[in-house]
From Swiss-Prot:
The lineage of its organism: Eukaryota, Metazoa, Chordata, Craniata, Vertebrata. Residues 63-188 bind DNA. It comes from the Eukaryota. May interact with calmodulin. Normally expressed in non-neoplastic adult central nervous system tissues: detected in whole brain, cerebellum, brain cortex, occipital lobe, frontal lobe, temporal lobe, putamen. Expression levels are low in oligodendroglial tumors, and are reduced by half in oligodendroglioma and astrocytoma cases with 1p loss of heterozygosity. Detected in neuroblastic-type cultured neuroblastoma cells. Expressed in heart and kidney. A motif (Nuclear localization signal) lies at residues 112-119. It comes from Homo sapiens (Human). Residues 875-953 form the IPT/TIG domain. GO terms for biological process: neuromuscular process controlling balance; positive regulation of calcineurin-NFAT signaling cascade; positive regulation of transcription by RNA polymerase II; regulation of transcription by RNA polymerase II. ANK repeats lie at residues 1064-1093, 1109-1129, 1143-1172. This is Calmodulin-binding transcription activator 1.
């Protein structure tokens, strides 16, 4: 089978064939004849060799007509295989001699037997041994069949330069070799960057070469790569010589390590060859990404012999020249710089190469011509414009902007008919904006001389190709269809399998008519991107709801001056979902939803001058551009809805004047004016009609700025200094980058027919906190009325006359309020843009919280950027670097563009950045001196993000204070930044939670409120004014932000914690304390009180939370000397003062040691006052007379809690379902129960701490009267009583639980306790109430939170009550003891830090009066004596036992602390009732600790009378059990509420009790163990003894056996000897006879011989013979 016509295939091929035989195809092989293979001696075997190839391969691969000489991207596996199986062409293609240093892109076919193709003159990377080349080998699959072998090497000089050799496994002699330099475009973000940046190899490597040698090596490597960065301004090229020189210099001078000057020259606006630092230090290529090549041929033109799939699917493009071009006869313009575009191939499907990453495309030489500077892509404005176009592309989208001069854009217009070719590149610049689908990037070229902007976002707007062709030659577009696997992976389109998506050209509606050459028609065919898969469903749904359904508008308006903004629109559809929240995903926008908006506007815009200024303005639109009516691109049939800002314009025939006075009459009713602001809008100001023409630049600038005075501040931030703040776009419409909102909001269709409600409910509020608060403020700017406030992008009215945004509302349909959707204010309910014309066309404007997303929705990073809107950097990591830079920094935010136009500014040093996945930019920080610098993201050199702080740290310093001692140091900026980050994170989280609900509401109401917005509207305004007033102070601004966030009721929903990064483990409260922001702290307390159920808040705002070095917020305030903040924190929760940091230092100690003596004294004074109060009535609560005071106490709690007693009874206990998440963690409602910050109720764990109760009671009695917050409903105790009176106990309980449950965040937990107990429950109940509230879900006695049922009031009740009562007394004592202890503690903070809590607790317990220790001591216990009965006690036992099973690991405080790290009981345990089953199922097994069963045995031993004497000593008395129970309960509560943060008091008491019981238990257990051990030993000994005996007997048996065996062997031996003797004898006898015979024979022989002797008588002889024969006688 392997033999093919007499010649054996090479061994490898045999093997691989055998593999292919089994490759799964039924007929496994097909024979192909291969040209004769010559053996090494050159003898050609004339017969053809047959090669076995899997049938599958032959079926799926086309034969190739030509092998391209160069290709500037990696081939896909299919292409490689196709070249290698086209055997019949190999002779023609084979190169017979090795080439020296083939150029970048070269593809060469060699026969390895004839050519030593590896000796190519390049220096390839060697292995560590320095001898052999480092090769990577891999087998590649085609159609699932392994058939190719690849061998890859890369240059040791330029690591991005690779040589890849491929051969068929079945025919290894023919090798396809491909040389390619793939600069890390994705790494450095600009095609030029990578070239240099990638050259960061060792100096050693470079040192070996002379300059000439280097140039010789490098020149071919960089063949075809364009050197300019064309960041928009510079087109200066660079030569290899300069590169080499620069590198050599840099290596000699040793600049900061790992940074290299990049030739990007793109710092904002800087022209020419100013080199800014590109320091992308790490530009090594990992997987080669695209090559930026715009060489002599167009970037993709492959000069090739002929194209791969040439003959196969030729699209009949309307003209015939395409073939020639395709064949490489025409140098192609550089158009799409794409990873895989080959201009040449027609519709060939290039399948992505799985093994080689086929890179994302790059727009390689943007504006390579120096004189093109004013083309749209250049300069700031144009940059903006482009950006805007780009903003909307999907993640993998790249925007190709290439200025093609004198060549048509080669791309394909998808449906072959002439009506597609979007108008031609005439002398006028036709912008071809085509967003193509499915990863195939096509630009739809314009053919015909009219200028046209054709925006065809086809199926998925993957790449926006903006190419302005400056020459009118009508070249036929060629399809550049490439499947870009990266795009595909990120955004797999519908129906596309990995093999390469079929072009869905049919999507593009073919109605775009080619309008006659004279006209400039811009047709936007926006066929929306099919379903872009998104992550944010909430938005999706909302979108799907029709808000955008209409959105694909085709604007055919001739005069649509597409300034940056407008161009965006269509592309907006492409937004691909990005991972960051910011991105809107339109995925569910149903594709075919209605493109009702097909329409065309005709009109002329006389005013557009042909100014060179960059813009998408038609440069010579001076003649009116009538558009034919039929340019309607009727999108209605095209399949995806395009999510453009264009709203459904149902019927309106008003004209929108897009430019100055152009009156475009909109013929079709559904006119969508994509009035994307800017150019479309005249500068709106009092000046009314500043037509484009008239307004000179200066004027324009003034105008615009006027137009948003409010904007003034924003514009300051964003305007590039360039033109006086106003960038003039062509025709004098000033484009104000400061229009902060521009990009954000959809253009309101002024003339929309009524129904167009556009609800852009933006989803995520990321933007809201700009880390630089200045930005923040801008974001919060809100409308104060007066058209001046409209953001610069006032949505212009659709007034048919002109855009003059006249002051009168009628003209300017959007009143400012509607327009200025202030960017971020969360409150921004729904602004509606009601256009004056279509009254109802209100755009229920987004909840701004979500504006950002809208922005994304709009697609528009670019837009935003263009409009000066700033994006939020949501996160970046790492936040620092050493001074030499070179660290990879990832920055997350709403970045969408897959183009390489991003850069990051580190303190104004620009470095290229690349989008490694939607929402994540990567850059490498430049070298910089130590210190903090701002880090911002720029797109096309326009800054588009807020600034965040990046730190350069000196090498000497550790990253973070590694020792506790440097810890409490402050870096203001860093802390401020962190505050903002924390808020941002919370806000994002909030947005996630609210998103869905708000969408529902929003989409429901197109009217102003949109449902959810109404509530927030008010605060919006207030916030705005507030912001203005407070603007100066960072703290006040943050307070405003917090208040706004606070006013949104979205916190209760969170079910899971999300906490991204913390700064040194510090929460918001820590940061505020460190900065000394007392007002902020109070605000946070209020916030926490208000949203008591929010886990997020609880994490961020908790006075007892500690950072990485165990510092509480109070510790920070004390350490940094912030008196006011420290007092606020201390009052809120005084326990924090006794929490030491990891070095054991207490806050007061640190304050003193750092010289903040006043602060320390103040806090000590507060402490003393409290203790004094405690001292006055320590025992108030013990006697039966306690009731009144408790009532008042409760009442006071109640009032603190602000809760109104009449909480609906219907609310059931949610706490019960999930206490773990609810109250226990987020119990804050009591903490700051009132919104007053004056009496800070106990936060968190405090609850059960009895002593705390006391202090609380005493402390609160006075405070209750002075509660200052207005919102405390002053309910007098009496009113309180009345309510409770009516409650039946069960109701009361339910009330508690209700309190505990989140639904009414404001009601504090205590409300319930306040409201019931007072009246008819006696203190027993009261206690129950209190404890329950505190313990919420606490097992057993107070399981109200859990069981929320009357059962709580049953037998269990006495227990708990008793517990409380008992406890109380203990506590009184404890309180005073502790207070004194604390005073001492304050005095000598450092010494008693390590106070042994156990001893303390034991002292306390010893101090407990004896009467309390009496069994039946029942203070104020009316009904519950049954408590003492063993039954009840034992009922608690099972619980206690299981608890102790866990708790017994808490012998010492430290252990207790550790135990706190995991919950002891699951949250909704119903078995806690005494009657319930034992809770042992809850206990977590701790392997070596006694089990619950052991404990229960121990405890029951205590209650049973039949305990043996020895045991009697070891058991607990009932009282001890009671105490133990309380302690355990306390621990559990505290623990439950504060996983991980045991409180000091709880530790003291509980640990002591438990410790004591534990010791007894240990003795008991020890005794038991001894007994068991004795028994065990005895039994073991017995069995051991028996075993020993048995073994001995066994040994004897063995011996006997052995002896017997040896005896047997002996016998056998003897026998053998005997037989041997016999045999011997026999042998001997037989030998004897033999000898005798022999002797006789010898004699006879002798006689015979002698017979003839004359001496012998013959007769004698004969006779003897006869005798012998027996004849003789």
């Amino acid at each position: 089978m392997w033999r093919a016509e007499g010649k054996w295939l090479p061994k490898t091929s045999r093997k691989s064939v055998s593999q292919s035989v089994f490759c799964g195809t039924s007929t496994y092989c097909v024979l192909n004849t291969v040209p004769p293979i010559e053996d090494d001696h050159g003898n050609s075997n004339s017969s053809h060799v047959k090669i076995f190839l899997p049938k599958k391969l032959l079926e799926c691969l086309p034969k190739c007509s030509s092998l391209p000489k160069e290709r500037h991207r990696w081939n896909t596996n299919e292409e490689i295989a196709a070249y290698l199986i086209t055997f019949e062409k190999h002779e023609e293609w084979l190169t017979t001699s090795p080439k020296t240093r083939p150029q970048n892109g070269s593809m060469i076919l060699y026969n390895r037997k004839k050519v030593k193709y590896r000796k190519d003159g390049y220096c390839w990377k060697k292995r560590k041994d320095g001898k052999t080349t480092r090769e990577d080998h891999m087998k590649l699959k085609v159609q699932g069949v392994e058939c190719l072998y690849g061998c890859y090497v890369h240059s040791s000089i330029i690591p991005t330069f690779h040589r890849r050799c491929y051969w068929l496994l079945q025919n290894p002699d023919i090798v396809l070799v491909h040389y390619l330099n793939v600069p890390a475009i994705e790494d450095c973000g600009k095609p030029c960057g990578p070239i240099l940046c990638s050259i960061n190899t060792d100096k050693k490597e470079w040192a070996k070469w002379t300059k000439e040698e280097l140039i010789g090596q490098l020149k071919p490597m960089f063949h075809g790569i364009k050197w300019t960065c064309s960041n928009g301004n510079s087109s200066s090229g660079f030569s290899v010589e300069q590169l080499v020189q620069q590198i050599l210099d840099s290596h000699q001078t040793k600049p900061q390590p790992r940074t290299h000057n990049c030739l990007c020259t793109g710092s904002l606006g800087a022209g020419g060859s100013v080199h800014h630092k590109c320091n992308s230090a790490k530009h090594r290529i990992i997987s080669p990404k695209v090559e930026p090549r715009t060489g002599g041929y167009g970037s993709h033109s492959e000069v090739q012999h002929n194209d791969v799939s040439e003959g196969k699917h030729e699209h009949s493009h309307s003209k015939g020249s395409s073939r020639e071009k395709r064949n490489g006869k025409v140098a192609k313009p550089v158009l799409l710089h794409q990873s895989s575009t080959e201009v040449s191939s027609t519709n060939q499907v290039e399948v992505p190469d799985t093994t080689q990453s086929s890179p994302v495309s790059i727009s390689s030489g943007l504006n390579s011509d120096p004189d093109m500077v004013d083309s749209p892509v250049v300069t700031g404005v144009s940059g903006m414009a482009v950006a805007s176009v780009m903003g909307s592309l999907s993640q993998s989208a790249t925007v190709f902007m290439s200025e093609v001069t004198n060549e048509a854009v080669y791309t394909m217009s998808p449906t072959a008919g002439p009506n597609h070719h979007l108008l031609s590149p005439d002398a006028s610049q036709g912008l071809v904006l085509a967003v193509s689908s499915d990863g195939h990037k096509f630009a739809f070229p314009t053919t015909g001389s009219s200028e046209s902007l054709s925006m065809l976002p086809t199926n998925v707007s993957e790449e926006l190709v903006l190419s302005t062709t400056l020459d009118g030659g009508r070249k036929i577009p060629e399809t550049t269809m490439n499947f870009d696997p990266d795009c595909f992976l990120n955004n797999p389109k519908q129906g596309q399998t990995y093999g390469g998506g079929g072009l869905k050209a049919e999507m593009v509606s073919s109605n775009i008519r080619h309008s006659p050459p004279g006209e400039r028609s811009f047709s936007f065919t926006t066929v929306l991107t099919k379903e872009i898969k998104t992550e944010d469903t909430s938005f999706e749904q909302q979108m799907a709801k029709e808000a955008y359904s209409s959105s694909a508008a085709a604007v055919a308006a001739s005069s649509l001056t597409l300034t940056a903004g407008s161009s965006l629109l269509p592309s907006g559809g492409g937004l691909s979902p990005s991972t960051t929240l910011e991105q809107m995903d339109f995925s569910a926008i149903d594709s075919n939803k209605d493109y009702t908006s097909s329409f065309s506007q005709t009109g002329h815009s006389p005013h557009i001058h042909q100014t060179p200024s960059p813009s998408f303005f038609l440069q010579d639109a001076s003649k009116p551009l009538p558009v034919e009516q039929n340019t309607h691109s009727s999108l209605s049939d095209s399949g995806g809805t395009f999510v453009m800002p264009t709203v459904k314009t149902e019927a309106s025939s008003q004209t929108s004047s897009c430019s100055g006075h152009v009156e475009t009459r909109i013929e079709s009713t559904s006119s969508l004016h994509l009035m994307q602001f800017q150019a479309n809008f005249q500068a709106m100001t009092a000046e009314g009609e500043v037509t484009m023409e008239t307004s000179q630049a200066a004027e324009g600038s003034e105008v615009l700025l006027k137009s948003g005075e409010l904007q003034a501040c924003s514009s300051e931030h964003y305007l590039q200094p360039e033109t006086n703040g106003v960038i003039r776009s062509a025709g004098g419409v000033p484009i104000l980058p400061g229009n902060v909102v521009q990009g954000l909001y959809p253009v309101a269709q002024p003339s929309l027919g009524n129904a167009s409600n556009m609800e852009l409910s933006l989803d995520h509020f990321d933007i809201s906190f700009s880390n630089q608060f200045s930005d923040l403020i801008n974001d919060f700017i809100s409308v104060e009325g007066g058209s001046s406030t409209i953001y610069g992008h006032q949505l212009v009215s659709g007034d048919s006359t002109a855009l003059s945004q006249s002051e009168d509302g009628a003209r300017a349909p959007f009143t400012q309020a509607e327009m200025c959707l202030p960017c971020c204010s969360p409150q921004q309910g729904s602004l509606q843009l009601s256009s004056s014309e279509g009254g109802a066309s209100t755009m229920a404007y987004m909840h701004v919280a979500e504006v950002v997303s809208a922005a994304s929705a709009q697609g528009t990073l670019g837009m935003l950027q263009q409009s000066g809107r700033v994006f939020m950097v949501t996160d970046y990591s790492p936040e620092w670097s050493y001074p030499e830079g070179g660290v990879k920094v990832l920055i997350t935010g709403p970045w969408q563009e897959a183009s390489n136009n991003y850069s990051c500014l580190f303190d104004q040093i620009s470095v290229p950045a690349s989008l490694i996945q939607p929402g994540v930019l990567r850059c490498y920080c430049p070298a910089h001196d130590t210190g903090l610098v701002t880090l911002q993201v720029a797109f096309n050199n326009q800054i588009i993000s807020n600034s965040v702080v990046f730190e350069y740290k000196a090498r000497a310093l550790p990253t973070l204070p590694s020792s506790q001692h440097d810890w409490l140091s402050l870096d203001d900026n860093q802390f401020r930044m962190s505050i903002l980050e924390r808020l941002e994170q919370m806000e994002r989280r909030m947005a996630e939670m609210t998103g869905s609900q708000q969408h529902k509401q929003a989409s429901g109401g197109g009217s102003s409120g949109g449902g959810s917005g109404s509530g927030n509207g008010g605060s919006q305004a207030q916030c705005a004014s507030g912001t203005g007033a407070l603007g100066s102070c960072f703290e006040s601004r943050v307070v405003v932000v917090c208040e706004k966030m606070m006013s949104r009721a979205c916190w209760a929903k969170s079910k899971h914690l999300i906490h991204s990064k913390t700064f040194r483990g510090m929460t918001l409260l820590h940061l505020a304390a460190a900065q000394g922001y007392a007002t902020l702290i109070q605000t946070l307390i209020k916030w926490r009180t208000k949203h008591a159920d929010s886990i997020d808040l609880e994490l961020e705002v908790d006075p007892l939370n500690v950072d990485h070095f165990s510092c509480t917020p109070l510790m920070w305030a004390c350490a940094l000397g912030h008196l006011e903040a420290a007092v606020v924190l201390y009052k809120w929760d005084r326990r924090a003062i006794s929490i030491p940091d990891s070095l054991g230092r207490l806050p007061l100690g640190i304050a003193r040691s750092r010289g903040h003596v006043k602060l320390a004294e103040c806090l000590e004074h507060l402490q003393r006052d409290e203790q004094a109060q405690l001292g006055q009535n320590p025992r108030i609560h013990c006697p039966a007379s306690e009731e009144p005071s408790t009532e008042s106490w409760m009442a006071q709690w109640h009032s603190e809690a602000i809760s109104s007693p009449e909480i609906p009874k219907g609310v059931t206990v949610i706490a019960s379902t999930n206490p773990e998440l609810r109250r226990p963690r987020s119990e804050p409602s009591n903490y700051y129960s009132s919104e007053s910050h004056k009496d800070y109720p106990a936060p968190k764990k405090h609850k059960l701490n009895p002593e705390y109760f006391q202090t609380r009671q005493e402390k609160l009695l006075p405070t209750a009267l002075s509660l200052e917050e207005p919102n405390i409903r002053k309910q007098s105790p009496s009113s309180k009583q009345s309510v409770p009176e009516t409650l039946s106990p069960s109701e009361g309980v339910r009330d508690f639980s209700r309190e505990l449950s989140p639904p009414t965040p404001e009601t504090a937990a205590f409300q319930a306790s306040g409201s019931q107990p007072v009246g008819k429950w006696n203190s027993k109940d009261l206690y129950i109430g209190v404890s329950t509230v505190q313990v919420t879900g606490n097992p057993k006695g107070t399981s109200v939170g859990k069981e929320a049922a009357p059962s709580q009031v049953r037998p269990r009740e006495p227990m708990s009550v008793l517990m409380m009562a008992n406890r109380e007394v203990v506590n009184t004592e404890l309180g005073s003891y502790r207070d004194s202890a604390e005073n001492e503690e304050c005095g000598q903070p450092m010494d008693d830090i390590q106070v042994n809590m156990m001893t303390l607790a034991e002292h306390i317990i010893e101090a407990t009066p004896d009467r309390i220790k009496q069994e039946n001591f029942v203070p104020m216990e009316s009904s519950g004596l049954e408590r003492t009965d063993p039954a009840t006690i034992s009922s608690t036992m099972s619980w206690l036992a299981s608890y102790l099973a866990d708790a017994d690991c808490l012998p010492s405080a430290a252990q207790i602390r550790s135990a706190y790290n995991e919950p002891l009981t699951p949250s909704s345990n119903t078995s806690l009732s005494p009657v319930g089953s034992p809770v042992s199922e809850i206990a977590f097994e701790k392997p070596n600790l006694p089990s619950a069963a052991d404990w229960s045995e121990f405890l029951s031993a205590s209650t049973s009378e039949k305990v043996e004497n020895e045991f009697a000593q070891l058991t607990l008395s009932d009282h001890e059990q009671r105490e133990l129970y309380e302690a355990a309960r306390l621990v559990q509560t505290a623990f439950r509420k504060y996983k991980g943060r045991p409180l000091r008091e709880q530790q003291e008491v509980a640990a002591a009790v438990i410790q004591r019981c534990y010791r007894k238990y240990k003795q008991y257990a020890l005794y038991k163990k001894m007994t068991q051990a004795a028994i065990l030993i005895q039994s073991k000994f017995r069995s051991y003894y028996e075993q020993k005996k048995f073994q001995q007997s066994r040994r004897a048996a063995v011996l006997i056996q052995k002896y017997y065996r040896s005896y047997k062997k002996c016998g056998k031996r003897r026998q053998a000897r005997r037989t041997a003797v016999i045999v011997q004898q026999k042998l001997r006898s037989s030998l004897l006879t033999k000898k005798q015979d022999q002797a006789a024979r010898k004699i006879m022989r002798f006689l015979r011989r002698c017979r003839h002797s004359p001496l012998v008588d013959h007769r004698l002889y004969k006779r003897s013979e006869r005798i012998e024969k027996g004849q003789g006688t």
